[in-house]
């Protein structure tokens, strides 16, 4: 029949909420129609549908086809059904239910359902199933929202917009419909507690508003249509195959139902529909009005493959299925606007699980105390789950007895549970009386509880159960921690390398790059690492990833690698991911949570999973997380710049590590006393009232020379603050020169450390040093002295420590607070650097050095010159002497003029000062302030300061200067062992390396000078070059035959002026010979000594060394002198560089490192290397040989040797070298003989005719030690000279070089 057209809305997808709810109503209406055919009643509530005034009487509500209701055409779905679900949607019966065939759209379901009707005339029931439309009626029947007292009520469902008219030609058969319903009634009906996928319930109920199904084990065969408290289940069927029962699909929709009284009847579908329409609870007599036949009302069976959300579980094949309903989207169409808005209560999150194929969704996944338990009714097959117990859900109704007697309703935030409550992942059900309990299987993939578990914030960090960590027991006295938790190894405290490393560790203020348990005191290393992590100008990630072990640290690392081979258990688990970080067992044993920060930072730094930006993000997160523990008293964004950790208070948290250096703290206290020992000279008007109360107290002065009696009583002035106080007893208490930084900030002209902003080349000074402050008035009184040049006085205001020292040397007085300084001479020597360059802006290069004890650029004191033994020589630590020797291009040995122990006066560095080079010692007054002042002064003039740091890293002062990276900074420590004779004292002379010096870019010498000179040329292109490594840069004051304080080198003119007149006309030849050095060696201890040498180059003029580059790493040339290439040893053995104050250093190609010069033949070496420098004496100056004398009396004779009275014969003999002899010589030592002949043919003796038949070489003369060394004796006794020279015979050449390699001791020939 025809139906009036209805406005067609936007088609909905299959499975939309309104369509499925309509299907539920259709099933209920079908059952009601069957009942109406048997029992005719007109006054009962169920006539509301089909009665006289029923909803479905009108023609306009009768003919609506199922495809129009669904609004979609059939389309196959092959994707997984759980992919579009949300958490607030629906729950699944079991994980295995999702493994079936895909979901069939509703249009296809209904087409299949009614396809068997054929062309027969549809009955009223079939017509009602086919053409029911309740949309208009439902949408126009608004009801008030459910309140707490009403059970099972909800808001009015929205109008289903999928309704549309359809052609009346749809064939519907009554018989088919009856047969189909008969088949369906014979199958047990299954219910769920969730809605269809992606389809929120029409009536949104509160979490605790639940209906209770009265179904018991055995009611499944009761024969009446049953619905659970959460909703009515509608089914879909497919066309049955030949001889097989039809295979059906399951669609589940939630319909709110009223609570059932204990023992009451089970509400049927019509009663449920009536409840939805009337929004009221059925009357007590509803049971008589709704008689159902047991043979027609059997529950219908489903194949347990409905549209349900994914939940954790296992499929039948054992493969885990992780389906989870996520919160979120509502796929329902927008309802038609109505006068009464639809109110929907939000649904809470539900976390559900499935543990096995036999489990039911009736088991709750929430906690019994936190979440209401759901109802699970029905089974996959008839009677398969008849024995399953069900946990009823509590209802909001007061008269409902379905609530568990022991359960209480709680409003817990979804997703959270109590820490002390039971595990929500364990399914819990209510056992029936007399039913044995069953053990539920736990789910393995549930989301864990998000309840924060916060450990105690105070006290040591223990395990969650409060027990100590594994391996925290005290260790035996001879064991240290190593490897996994609880494992140890033997300690090696007595090893020499370990003892040296421990000494360096105790003296260092920075974290050591290699920490071993034998060093002890891990708190010091942890504190240093934490300071490094929070340092704003350092890169802890780069340093922790590669601390660059060099020198002694590398040797110590190799020692432990050999000591602990890869067979130990600790090779896989070492307890520390980076070498600077101590074993984590130390932190676990002490329970120090803060010590985990270096381990976490090191783990991030060593990880390959993050790039640089990601690592620094994690580092910044760690800084924020641990800031409250590392700096508990911090109040700003930069805690490392404002916290003083040197003075622990009684309120210091347990997580704060103690001060790692008590001795350093004591030294700092002498400069900047703690807060309880400081006071300000006067109040500042700009200070807040709170800060004034802290600084108004008169406190003890920390100055060493200040004498303050214990009974001094000073009363405050009653009048103006500026007036002096009234003295009641005792002398006046002098105010301290240095106080703490005022709370309102320092004055612009006050005395404090000016730390430049941004990245720094040097370590950041401590917070205590930065808090020291001196008032401008005090500075003016302290620096107003002729000792301090006016131009350099601002540098003193940059160093409060220097001001405190100046104040300590001034005695106090009654009227004059700052008298003349005591110890003027000592103070003058410490500020002598201010007189090197008058104007600070004329400084171009700043050289920083660390002098040895006893070294002073001002020379030795006159009073202690005779008694003071002088400085002690150190072969490993370079001080002022090594620095000046490198600048003057000469050797520095204990017997040379360059060593400070031989000085009788101050060295002269005026030549360097004239070119803008300032030498500053770490012990000079205001050392830190001078560097920071020069950096600030030149930066303000937009100029860059060149800084050459000759201080070893471990010798850097604790609160040293902070130098900005705006300036040029080169670190090149001075190393005495760069000289071959110091590095190999036993073999350097025999190998020909007596005057060889190894150069490196990281060693103070020509290589590092080249970097500075290049930068200088770029910054100051129009100025005179620095010329650092030149003989004329430094002049020494030593004792020579010209006098006890002779400035050397003494020029030849000065030598003739001051020395020769004393011996003019002298008749005593012995005295004349002693005074002029007649017959003495030309050079003694590398300096010109004889008369002809002094008359030519000047007295004390030094020979120049030969520099051999060895790469960036010092010591890379090899552990022995023989490791130096042969061509380098041959060159150094024959080379003799005469004194030249303006000559550049002679640097050969590298002998070690990345680029090593390799020569395949002697000719290649001759062409690549420069000619061997030699000393040639013109006629009339005596013998042609040049004699050198060492400190041990050994003489080296350089010249032409092996001459003969028959020149032609000798020359012919030289030319008659047979091929056999040449091959034999090269076989013995190819390099030695080849290089010698090659250079001799160009330079040497046999060709110039001066010494026929000879060649140029060196001979070693052995004499008694010290005989030829004494310069104050008369004529030296004659000595026996054993000549060892290179001659023109191949037989002699073999003897000269000692066979292959030239490493045999020299042999004398008769």
From Swiss-Prot:
It is found in: Host nucleus; Host cytoplasm; Virion tegument. The modification Phosphoserine is found at residues 686, 722. Changing residue 546 to L: Decreases DNA-binding. GO terms for biological process: DNA-templated viral transcription; positive regulation of DNA-templated transcription. Residues 1228-1250 have a biased composition (Acidic residues). A motif (Nuclear localization signal) lies at residues 677-685. GO terms for molecular function: DNA binding. Residues 341-350, 1217-1227 have a biased composition (Basic and acidic residues). Interacts with IE4 and IE63. Interacts with host USF1 and SP1. Belongs to the herpesviridae ICP4 family. This is Major viral transcription factor ICP4 homolog. It comes from Varicella-zoster virus (strain Dumas). The lineage of its organism: Viruses, Duplodnaviria, Heunggongvirae, Peploviricota, Herviviricetes.
